[in-house]
Amino acid sequence: QISGPSAAVMYWNQREKSRHTFMGEWTRSGDKYTRDADGYYHYCGRSDDMLKVSGIYVSPFEVEGALMTHEAVLEAAVVAHADTDQLIKPKAWVVLKPGLAASDALADQLKQHVKDKLAPYKYPRWLEFVAELPKTATGKIQRFKLRG
C-alpha cells in the first residue's frame, strides 16, 4: 500500500474497483516489493503477475532475469500456466539473439540455466521461442496476450 499527495482517490465511474483499491489515504497499488538486509526495496512485479508455485510466490521478473543472463537470449517473458493437474507453473516466451535458431536442445539448456541460477521450482516448465513479444506503444510487455 502507498500513500501521499500524488495518489489518486478513485477510479472514474468504477465504484467497485475504487472500493477495493482506495482505503482512506492509502492506495493498494498491486505492486510487489521485497526489502533486502540493507533496507533497500526491490520491485518484483505486479501482484496480478505473480505466480504461486508449490505454495510459494515467484516473480516473473526473477525468472526472466535468469533467462536474460543466457548468451542466446535477447528478451524473455514469463507468465503463469496450468499443467494437466491444474497446478500453476512458469511458462516462458523467449526471443533469441539474431542469427540463433530455436531447438528443443536449446529449450532444455535454457531450463537448466534457470535451475542453476534459481531455486529449482522456479524454472519454466514450458518454453516457446517467438520472433517478438507483444508490447504496448511504450514498450511494456502485454502479458495478458501471453496468458491467452
Short names for language-model regions:
Residues 127-130:
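General small-molecule cofactor/ligand-binding pocket signal
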Residues 4, 9-10, 17-20, 32-122, ...:
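AMP-binding/adenylate-forming catalytic core of the ANL superfamily
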